[in-house]
Amino acid sequence: HTAYRRQRQMCIRDSFYSQPRMFYRSQTPIEQAHIASAIVFELSKVETPYIRERMVAQLLTVDETLGKRVADGLGMKPVPKPIEPTVPVQDLPLSPALQLIGKAKPTLEGRKVAILVADDSNAEMLEKYKAAITAAKATPFIVAPKISITLNNGETIAADGQLAGSPSVLFDAIVSIIMPEQAKKLAKVSEAIAWFKDAHAHLKAIAYCGATDEFILIPQHIEKDASVVALKEIETFIEKAKSREWDREPNVRDLA
């Protein structure tokens, strides 16, 4: 047992920096940014400067770029020297299997897509989106300012959720099918503005109509990209809704 414990301690010592290095370097660039930002967040809560500095010194030994990113995120000056390891740090073979984003398969199956409608919304377009979302094995969820609304064909329908109680954080992608008069009203409603801005900040796909663009997206500086698509581009929206728009992230938040 003593020999086993000694061998185990040696293995732990030898891989103390090598394993974290291999893990970090195996990630995609966006995952590396998230790791660095998460460490910055956690260390920002540490009140003792020496502990923060010691942790950054450890990170510099794991990976110099990671350590410098965290130090910069904390505004740490001067940057501490890396820890001197007791054994040389190994550059182990990288493993893409450790990634989450990198190996994720685009899919809408089992997910939920919100469709924002209001009085006079286009009934035909609503049905097209419901059918496309269902065909992708996802669940369409009708959101409206009021539970009961009347579409442009005279049909009165019941929404699945009221806008104020159905924030976009609950959905994997969002669609907006509203007329100009309704868009003007919603442009003055904080919950509606947050509905779009949060979806954009959370890197979700957005399908927008002309009124949504004119009265909400443009005034709120919600920029277009590959996953913010015009309402008529149903097939494109479905494809983009299967994953997040990671290229958008540097434009909506400051990552380490």
Predicted regions and their residues:
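A generic "binding-loop/recognition-motif" signal
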Residues: 212
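Single, functionally critical "micro-switch" positions that shape active/binding sites
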Residues: 4, 47, 209
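Extended, subdomain-level signal for the structured scaffold at the beginning of enzyme domains
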Residues: 23, 27-201, 215-256
